Amino acid sequence: MAAEEQPLLGRDRGSGQVHSGAAADQELCIDQAVVFIEDAIKYRSIYHRMDAGSLWLYRWYYSNVCQRVLGFIIFLILILAFVEVPSSFTKTADVRYRSQPWQPPCGLTETIEAFCLLAFLVDLSVKGYLVGQAQLQQNLWLLAYFMVLVVSVVDWIVSLSLACEEPLRMRRLLRPFFLLQNSSMMKKTLKCIRWSLPEMASVGLLLAIHLCLFTIIGMLLFTIGEKDEAQDQERLAYFRNLPEALTSLLVLLTTSNNPDVMIPAYTQNRAFALFFIVFTLIGSLFLMNLLTAIIYNQFRGYLMKSLQTSLFRRRLGARAAYEVLASRAGPAGTTPELVGVNPETFLPVLQKTQLNKTHKQAIMQKVQSYEGRPMLADEFQKLFDEVDKGLAKERPLKPQYQSPFLQTAQFIFSHHYFDYLGNLVALGNLLSICVFLVLDSDLLPGERDDFVLGILDYIFILYYLLELLFKVFALGLPGYLSYHSNVFDGLLTIILLVSEICTLAVYRLPHSGWKPEQYGPLSLWDMTRLMNTLIVFRFLRIIPNIKPMAEVANTILGLIPNLRAFGGILVVAYYVFAMIGINLFRGVIVPPGNSSLVPDNNSAVCGSFEQLGYWPNNFDDFAAALITLWNVMVVNNWQVILEAYKRYAGPWSMVYFVLWWLVSSVIWINLFLALLLENFLHRWDPQGHKQLLVGTKQMSVELMFRDILEEPKEEELMEKLHKHPHLHLCR
């Protein structure tokens, strides 16, 4: 394009161009700098079209409104799984009591899905146009995006042509891709997992050898002889055949069925306990923890590579903006030399950048500290480090009172000792609830006398209300609301007050033998339980007042935004496995009396799927499938589910559940532990804390590891800029 052919630097702004052309060029430079800065802040690639029309489209596409709409469309197409056949609209997932669910008519969800696919097609078209044909052909994610859309559209057409009666909908399995491709951090996490797979596979091979060897040894040790009595045969049931033995030891690897597997053999001969102890020591305590260590080490290394790429993108985007905005000076007739970016040139760019007010003010203050002189490249780069820091909020000023009495009261109620008093009162309230729970544990709700507890609730809630009013008086309403703990405390206090007023209006004042009849949707006992539950939650207010607990809580809260990528990967895994499970196991779990495979309740084996009432663990709809997968991921009693599906669906169902265990409990949990450990180690490292500025806090994974990442060299940045297909520099 014409605008792209002109060099961005070195243009003679004093030439005889018409004023409108010079103004258009200057406006284009500003827009280019704005986009480069936004790319740097968001760690986006700068390899896209740079003409005026493309820049407008690019900024519109990455605007908050457009991205939120795209995020909602992704959420909408994923949530369709709860509505589509088989629908999850039943009160219970238990196959014994589940009613016939409402099923949407053919074409309803397909229409919504068509709208979503059309939106994704527009999304792909915009992305493809902005990066250009050359970049599009090299971008595997965009090519995969195109293929997923093609398969989804073809499958959608097949669904309509078969009147929504097709047995398999392939596009459901592909839906999580739309979530993956929209998150750069999820892509990096997935790439890190892929790079870590060889090392995981090596430990997995060791685990497989360990399992096979001990399975063979177990079969040799615990083989049932011809002369064994019936009770001995029952004791050795876990090693009846090779698949049974392998399954038993695999479950024992997760310690889920310990000591169930060991006790039958141990009962016969106490020396057999050594077999299970050695197996558990090698498998669970050594190899599984070795797998955790390897995943932590490998993932951390590959995560550093991904974050190094993000840092390079940040520096490259900032350097591109610097090159666009930098002025040149030099004697007449010589090649002008770069002298830097003037603050008056940069401030209009900063005003147009999509950035929150706090960070803009922080960057402006840093720019003003240069006292009007041009900023050099390193100084310009450091401006955008402010984006990763959350500045400490300045508390609003307290109200000014003239009366000495009011000033004394303000001092008392704003002192931290007043908070300690409130914590003691909250502790007393919690203890009183515990006392009554113990005293009334053997009584039915109708037999309990709630007179004393009701009076205590009134007294404590009255104190909480007075505490709220006193704090508002001392700090002022803006000052009171500036503390998150006060907002949490005040909100619960207001809810408690409203609940108590409703109780008074319906059931009047409490008195001895107070057992009124139920009026409205909630009984007196329900109202009391609701208020006491809120009081228990209110006790969490003590966390900010206990420093070690507050540090742990702040670390966890700071970790939550950085876990979105890991949470997204888990959502993708759940979604795909749930869809596969529905296609494989829908309808295989049948209620008692409907199949010869289902034993009568009286004849069910103790500890079996039927005897434990695990009927809701099925794949008859999407919601039930998610809960079943969750129960398997937790691995508590998961052998019961494995054994049941082996009976109902066949022995090959074990492959599905073992794969899910590997993906969720082994790989994902260990990746989560890796990030959690790194986060805690870094945040609690005294050296790390010394590097933080006073009044700031770390916000992102990139900043968390910034001190151990290598800064890109200027030569590398300039080489990449010169290779930009739509950007032409003079040097």
From Swiss-Prot:
The chain crosses the membrane at residues 69-89, 112-132, 140-160, 168-188, 204-224, 271-291, 418-438, 450-470, 487-507, 525-542, 565-585, 657-677. InterPro entries: Ion_trans_dom, TPC2, Volt_channel_dom_sf. The keyword Nucleotide-binding does not apply. It is found in: Late endosome membrane; Lysosome membrane; Melanosome membrane. Regulated by Mg(2+) ions, cytosolic Mg(2+) selectively inhibits outward current while lysosomal Mg(2+) modestly inhibits both the outward and inward currents. In the absence of Mg(2+), NAADP readily activates TPCN2, with properties similar to PI(3,5)P2. Na(+) current is inhibited by ATP in a MTORC-dependent manner. ATP sensitivity is independent of PI(3,5)P2. Both current elicited by PI(3,5)P2 as well as NAADP are inhibited by tetrandrine. Residues 1-68, 133-139, 189-203, 292-417, 471-486, 543-564, 678-731 are cytoplasmic. N-glycosylated. Pfam families: Ion_trans. Disruption phenotype: Loss of NAADP-mediated calcium release. Mutant mice are highly susceptible to hepatic cholesterol overload, have hyperlipoproteinaemia and liver damage consistent with non-alcoholic fatty liver hepatitis. TPCN1 and TPCN2 double knockouts are viable, fertile, have no obvious morphological abnormalities, and no obvious behavioral defects. After fasting for 3 days, they are less active and endurance performance is reduced by 8.3 fold in contrast to wild-type littermates that show no changes. Two days after re-introduction of food, mutants regain endurance and become as active as before fasting. One of its GO terms (cellular component) is monoatomic ion channel complex. Keywords: Calcium, Calcium channel, Calcium transport, Endosome, Glycoprotein, Ion channel, Ion transport, Lysosome, Membrane, Repeat, Transmembrane, Transmembrane helix, Transport, Voltage-gated channel. It catalyses: Ca(2+)(in) = Ca(2+)(out); Na(+)(in) = Na(+)(out). It is a multi-pass membrane protein. Residues 239-263, 619-641 dip into the membrane without crossing it. GO terms for biological process: calcium-mediated signaling; endocytosis involved in viral entry into host cell; endosome to lysosome transport of low-density lipoprotein particle; intracellular calcium ion homeostasis; intracellular pH reduction; lysosome organization; negative regulation of developmental pigmentation; receptor-mediated endocytosis of virus by host cell. Belongs to the calcium channel alpha-1 subunit (TC 1.A.1.11) family. Two pore calcium channel subfamily. Homodimer. Interacts with LRRK2. Interacts with HAX1. Interacts with MTOR; the interaction is required for TPCN2 ATP sensitivity. Found in a complex with LSM12, TPCN1 and TPCN2. Interacts with LSM12. This is Two pore channel protein 2. It comes from Mus musculus.
